């Protein structure tokens, strides 16, 4: 492996989670670059923003994905984007499985273009493949995370009752 201090982390999606990842990585000495439609106020780390993901990944040792699954983001990590990445880059996908084209990830790992692909969303096509690190999807399975979800639900309900605001809806346009 290599040290991460001084390396560049590119974050695709600087919402609440992406911003926290950026702050933590910066605290560990990483340089942060980003591409995001919206930047969450949690972001306190210095972050050079790129309008074009293909340009951003050219400078990244690591690329971390934190975007929702939308028509515009499905398959965004594909052979064309990977071709723009530094040789030996590492891709981290802890967001959604359909953001990557699995065949393109496997081909890039086999050719050495990518050094690693890390995910907690792997299906059987990716498990036990060389260069793939797969962990269980347990990020929200802590006591604190459950407490935070309950607190957020209460806050959102109160905001709706008191002000008519609907945020973070999964079924309201």
Task: Tell me the role of every PLM-derived stretch.
Residues 1-5, 97, 133, 139:
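Phosphate/diphosphate ligand-binding glycine-rich loop within oxidoreductases
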Residues 1-20:
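Glycine-rich NAD(P)-binding loop of Rossmann-like domains
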Residues 12, 35, 119, 136:
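Active-site flanking residues adjacent to catalytic metal/cofactor-binding acidic residues
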Residues 14, 57, 146-150:
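Amphipathic, non-transmembrane alpha-helical scaffold segments
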Residues 24-25, 85:
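Aromatic pocket-lining residues of Rossmann-like dinucleotide-binding sites
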Residues 30-31:
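Residues at the starts of beta-strands that form the adenosine-phosphate
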Residues 37-126, 141:
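Rossmann-like adenosine-cofactor binding region
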Residues 116-117, 123-173:
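C-terminal helix-to-coil terminal segments
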């Amino acid at each position: 492996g290599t040290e991460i201090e001084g390396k560049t982390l590119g974050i695709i999606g600087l919402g609440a989670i992406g911003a926290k990842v950026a702050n933590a990585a910066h605290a560990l000495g990483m340089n942060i670059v980003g591409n995001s439609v919206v930047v969450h106020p949690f972001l306190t780390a210095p972050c050079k923003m790129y309008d074009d993901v293909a340009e951003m990944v050219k400078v990244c040792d690591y690329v971390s994905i934190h975007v929702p699954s939308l028509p515009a983001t499905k398959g965004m990590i594909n052979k064309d984007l990977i071709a723009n990445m530094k040789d030996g880059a590492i891709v981290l996908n802890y967001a959604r499985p359909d953001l990557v084209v699995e065949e393109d990830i496997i081909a890039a790992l086999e050719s050495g273009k990518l050094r690693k692909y890390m995910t907690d969303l792997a299906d059987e096509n990716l498990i036990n493949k060389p260069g793939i690190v797969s962990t269980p999807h347990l990020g929200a399975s802590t006591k604190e995370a459950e407490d935070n979800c309950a607190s957020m639900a209460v806050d959102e309900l109160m905001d709706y009752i008191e002000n008519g605001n609907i945020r973070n809806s999964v079924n309201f346009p």
